[in-house]
Amino acid sequence: MGLLLLLVGIGGGFGAMARFALTQATASISKQIPLGILLCNIIGSLIIGMMAAFLIETKLFNEDVSTYVRFLLVTGFLGGFTTFSSFSLDILNLLQRGEIFIAIGYIWLVS
C-alpha cells in the first residue's frame, strides 16, 4: 500500500506540473476558452484509454509490474494531468463489467 501511494503521489505531482505548464503555454492563445484544460482532458482521456487497453490486452508486463505502471502513470500522472480522466476510467470499467445502467446513472449524477 505504501509503495502504491508513493507512486500515485509522484505521478500525480508530475501530472499536475504538466497540466500547469500546458495551461500557461496556451493561456495567450484563447482568453474565452480554457484551452489548456480542454487539451489536458482530451489528451489525458485519450492516453488513459490507450493505457487501459494496452495493459489489459498485452502480456508485456507481469501483474505486479502492470499494477505499478497503472498506479504511477494512469492513476498518478494522468489523474494529476487531467480533471476528467478518472471519471472516464470509472465509466470504462463499469461498461467493461456490463454495468451499463450504473454507468449511465454515474454520468447523470456527475454531469
UniProtKB/Swiss-Prot annotation:
One of its GO terms (molecular function) is fluoride channel activity. It catalyses: fluoride(in) = fluoride(out). It is a multi-pass membrane protein. It is found in: Cell inner membrane. The chain crosses the membrane at residues 2-22, 36-56, 71-91. GO terms for biological process: cellular detoxification of fluoride. The keyword Acyltransferase does not apply. It comes from the Bacteria. InterPro entries: FluC. Na(+) is not transported, but it plays an essential structural role and its presence is essential for fluoride channel function. Keywords: Cell inner membrane, Cell membrane, Ion channel, Ion transport, Membrane, Metal-binding, Sodium, Transmembrane, Transmembrane helix, Transport. Na(+) binds at G79, T82. GO terms for cellular component: plasma membrane. Its main location: membrane. Belongs to the fluoride channel Fluc/FEX (TC 1.A.43) family. Fluoride-specific ion channel. Important for reducing fluoride concentration in the cell, thus reducing its toxicity. This is Fluoride-specific ion channel FluC. It comes from Francisella tularensis subsp. holarctica (strain LVS). The gene is fluC.
